[in-house]
C-alpha cells in the first residue's frame, strides 16, 4: 500500500530513450520520497516496457519499477507469468505490473472481461510456478481506467487503479463510485507535465495532447463533464492557425507546461486532496531536447 507522501514518475520510451530511463532509475533510487517508476508502452509498437523495466531493476535496489501499462491481451498468460516470475526473483519482488485493454473495441464490457480473465490466467500460472519458490510474490498490479464502470469492475482483481490525464473532479467522481471498496485500492494518476527550453513549445505540446485525447470519445465525454471540451477545440484552432496559445487555468487543473516549483507542488497537492494516493509525474519533452535538460527536469520534479 502506498504511503501518505509517496510519489511516482513515468517515462515513455518515445520521449525518454531507454538508456536514459535506466540512467534515471539509477539516479532516482536514493530518493526516499519516490516509490515507483512506471514505463508506459507505446501504442504503435517499438521498445517493450517489461524489458526496459528489467534493466532498471538490475541497477536499482529500492524502487518499485514496472509497466505502466502493457496491453495484457497481447500476451500469452503462461509466458507472461514466467517473465514475471523471473523479474520478481531477480528484483526481490520489486516489479509492478500495470495493465490495460488497449482499444476497447465495439463491446468495451466484453474487452474488460477478457482483460480480467487474462490477468486471472496469468496469476494462476504464476502461482503454479511459485509453489516451489517460497518468497516470490505476484507483482503489485495496477489496472488503467478512466470511467467509473471500469474502476468498479476491477475491484478484487488488482492492487490499484491508474487514472490518466483527468481533472481532480473526475478523480473524486471515480473514487466516490467505489464505495467501501476504495479502501482496498491504491489510486494512482498520471500527471502530465510538458517541458521545453522554449515556453511556446511547451504550451504547444500541452494543447496538442489535449486535442489528441479529445478525439477519444471517452475522454471527450470527460472533458465535456468538466466544461473544457469547447475550450480545447478553440485552443487547437488557434494553434493550427499559427497563433501562440497559453493554457487556461481550467486546462492547468489537468496538465501543466513548464511549471514553477510552487505551481508543481500545488498541482500535486490538488490531486492528493482529490484522493490520489500515488501521484505519478509524467514529464514530456520535445525529441530534440538534450539529455542533460531532461535529467535536470526529472531530478527537479522528483525532489519537489
Place the predicted regions along the sequence by residue.
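N-terminal beta1-alpha1-beta2 module of alpha/beta enzyme domains
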Residues: 1-60
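Acidic (Asp/Glu)-rich catalytic clusters
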Residues: 2, 25-31, 53-64, 84-95, ...
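Flexible, glycine-rich active-site loops centered on histidine and acidic residues
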Residues: 2-16, 74-136, 165-177, 201-219
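Active-site mouth loops of central-metabolism enzymes
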Residues: 5-20, 68-78, 137-145, 193-196, ...
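Hydrophobic faces of well-ordered beta-strands that scaffold small-molecule active sites
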Residues: 5-13, 35-39, 64-68, 95-99, ...
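Glycine-rich, proline-tolerant flexible connector loops at the mouths of alpha/beta enzymes
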Residues: 35-59, 71, 103-110, 165-168, ...
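An alpha-helical appendage that flanks or caps ligand/catalytic pockets
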Residues: 112-132, 137, 172, 176-274
Amino acid at each position: 500500500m502506498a504511503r501518505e507522501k509517496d510519489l511516482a514518475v513515468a517515462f515513455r520510451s518515445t520521449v525518454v530513450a531507454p538508456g536514459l530511463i535506466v540512467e534515471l532509475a539509477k539516479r532516482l533510487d536514493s530518493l526516499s520520497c519516490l516509490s515507483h517508476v512506471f514505463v508506459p508502452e507505446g501504442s504503435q509498437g517499438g521498445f517493450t516496457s517489461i524489458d526496459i523495466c528489467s534493466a532498471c531493476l538490475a541497477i536499482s535496489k529500492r524502487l518499485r519499477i514496472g509497466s505502466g501499462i502493457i496491453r495484457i491481451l497481447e500476451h500469452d498468460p503462461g509466458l507472461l507469468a514466467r517473465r514475471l516470475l523471473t523479474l520478481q526473483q531477480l528484483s526481490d519482488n520489486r516489479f509492478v505490473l500495470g495493465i490495460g485493454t488497449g482499444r476497447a473495441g465495439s463491446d468495451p464490457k466484453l474487452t474488460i472481461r477478457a482483460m480480467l480473465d487474462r490477468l486471472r490466467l496469468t496469476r494462476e500460472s504464476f502461482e503454479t510456478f511459485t509453489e516451489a519458490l517460497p518468497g516470490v510474490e505476484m507483482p503489485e498490479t495496477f489496472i488503467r481506467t478512466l470511467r467509473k464502470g471500469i474502476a468498479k469492475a476491477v475491484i478484487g482483481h488488482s492492487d490499484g487503479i491508474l487514472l490518466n490525464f483527468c481533472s481532480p473532479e473526475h478523480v473524486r467522481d471515480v473514487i466516490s463510485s467505489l464505495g467501501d471498496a476504495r479502501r482496498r485500492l491504491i489510486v494512482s494518476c498520471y500527471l502530465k507535465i510538458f517541458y521545453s527550453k522554449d515556453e511556446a513549445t511547451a504550451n504547444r505540446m500541452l494543447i496538442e495532447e489535449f486535442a489528441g485525447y479529445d478525439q477519444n470519445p471517452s475522454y471527450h465525454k470527460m472533458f465535456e463533464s468538466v466544461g473544457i471540451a469547447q475550450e480545447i477545440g478553440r485552443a487547437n484552432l488557434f494553434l493550427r492557425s499559427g497563433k501562440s496559445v497559453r493554457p487556461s487555468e481550467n486546462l492547468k487543473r489537468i496538465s501543466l507546461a513548464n511549471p514553477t516549483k510552487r505551481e508543481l507542488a500545488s498541482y500535486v497537492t490538488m490531486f492528493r486532496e482529490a484522493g490520489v494516493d500515488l501521484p505519478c509525474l509524467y514529464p514530456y519533452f520535445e525529441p530534440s531536447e538534450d539529455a542533460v535538460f531532461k535529467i535536470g527536469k526529472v531530478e527537479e520534479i522528483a525532489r519537489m
